[in-house]
Amino acid sequence: MGAIDLSFSQSLLFSSSRSNLSSSTHRSVSFLPPGSKSRCLPPLRSMSHDDDTASKEVKLWGGRFEESVTEKVEKFTESISFDKVLYKQDIMGSKAHASMLAHQGLITDSDKDSILRGLDDIERQIEANKFEWRTDREDVHMNIEAALTDLIGEPAKKLHTARSRNDQVATDFRLWCRDAIDTIIVKIRNLQRALVELALKNEALIVPGYTHLQRAQPVLLPHVLLTFVEQLERDAGRYVDCRARLNFSPLGACALAGTGLPIDRFMTANALGFTEPMRNSIDAVSDRDFVLEFLYTNANTGIHLSRLGEEWVLWASEEFGFMTPSDSVSTGSSIMPQKKNPDPMELVRGKSARVIGDLVTVLTLCKGLPLAYNRDFQEDKEPMFDSTKTIMGMIDVSAEFAQNVTFNEDRIKKSLPAGHLDATTLADYLVKKGMPFRSSHDIVGKLVGVCVSKGCELQNLSLEEMKKLSPVFEEDVFGFLGVENSVNKFSSYGSTGSNCVAEQLGYWVNKLNITST
């Protein structure tokens, strides 16, 4: 698979009416005043530098320091190598912040316009791969702010008014997570469609259902496939819930205590599509529960996908032989010429361990931290980025696999008679005749014992053999025996009966807007 882009386009939620900015929600937010014209600034001047120059550049926080950090400390503490993927969100937050500062009279409109145009130019440079990310500038925030200062000078120094990197990074990360969730939900819908379409192509196919990996009862294949559709729907719901809880703005909380400057946090929250500002400034910068919830949801989704992978790896084996993946989603062996392996689904199963591990990493990271912000939080990014990239790949390849498999109907049908799959249906027959279920369970168990000793199936027994165990059996019993008859007897809501499964399929066809297969 190709690399997955982890920079997401920003989508906005409903805006707060308390803002002085536009309350439109489903269009891009403009941070230029009406009637102003955007102009393209000259390219950033070269930021190439040797080690000498780098060591002499004063850190933006360096006022009280008399020595530069050592090279080892600088390399150990930098995060630009991974947090630069937040550049869109960082620029977006800075635009909203600058517009608010101007609106509140904390900077001039001229300064604001210079800042906005400079940020636009930096974004273009980044997207054209012409921006030089500098380790000595530590992180995405400092790289962009320092570059903005190089570009426009004095106005850039006013941008950080009433803002700390503590609330800045929390804002950026919430925006990133919000966009990532939107992308994942779209991918889940695509996988659900692939599974439903596969079910529609095999609507009447009966397969063995298993418990303890032992044959249990006959079920329709669409019923099995819709199991994963339902699980994915709950996963999507968890993402929606997570998105709603994280969609509150930390911006303006500053380091931890807020500010005495007359900022408008509702204005920036609205501009960025947040529901409203977070109520408590310490909470805004000191908690990463939104990251944990997102990581848990990825892990839970990963477990569901892992079980799908396990099912299909088994079914593709010679021992089962229920499905055949196409060559386009299979791989071979370097030594065994005959091999055709369902590697994508094996890796889906395997990569679930990564998303679980990423969750455990951040759970451990957050345990026992004192209030408020701690540099430990820098370590929440890589697990989050890895988990998100991994779960997206797992979802995508599962959909690809579902679109490139065929079920071996003849092989499945030949295997169906084995295992006495209709035994429970036979017990239900006796219940319908008035027998207590425990008694019917005992009688059918004894009939299975007869079949095992004779090497036959229940439907091969004669009526006389059945009557030896209970006079309740009549000729109509044969309408309950055999996998087809057994499946047709299921009628409870959500069951594997043909009518029930048809209703389930109809529900998902409508919900997912599937028009053809």
Curated annotation (Swiss-Prot):
Organism: Arabidopsis thaliana (Mouse-ear cress)
EC number: 4.3.2.1
Superkingdom assignment: Eukaryota
Protein name: Argininosuccinate lyase, chloroplastic
InterPro entries in the record: Arg_succ_lyase_C (IPR029419), Argininosuccinate_lyase (IPR009049), Fumarase/histidase_N (IPR024083), Fumarate_lyase_CS (IPR020557), Fumarate_lyase_fam (IPR000362), Fumarate_lyase_N (IPR022761), L-Aspartase-like (IPR008948)
Cellular compartments per GO CC: chloroplast; chloroplast stroma
Family the UniProt entry places it in: Belongs to the lyase 1 family. Argininosuccinate lyase subfamily.
Catalytic activities: 2-(N(omega)-L-arginino)succinate = fumarate + L-arginine
Example GO BP: L-arginine biosynthetic process
